[in-house]
């Protein structure tokens, strides 16, 4: 039995618990339980619309109760780049965000959310969508991601993103709806 398996077993017991006044009970039963799918996830698009850390944590707690094990965090979109960049702070400048200007997650908040997910046995997978859905990048740099200049910037930027999420085994890069 793994720590994660024990955690999911507790969630099953929580789901079976009935409350009658101040008393809690579980009907006698036999449980055979395992996931139908290895990855049971949820994607939250904060690139288009910023969501507070408090709300994200509430969502992760609910996901965990229902044994969802992946939280896909879509951080960049045409509307905004929501992850703080120390090397390219213009990405987080209000004038480069077309929706909810000035709203982004600090590096410390991103690391905090990774830790919070781990505590709830949920894997956080950050996404930096590229090269499509990148109008916020273009507004900040005046270069398309696919240009020579854009690729040089992206290399540095992705190094920074990987440092922020060094405890996470995956980084999603989108790659949908690319225009050539």
Segments predicted by a language model, with ranges:
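Feature activates predominantly on carbohydrate-active enzymes
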Residues: 1-172, 179
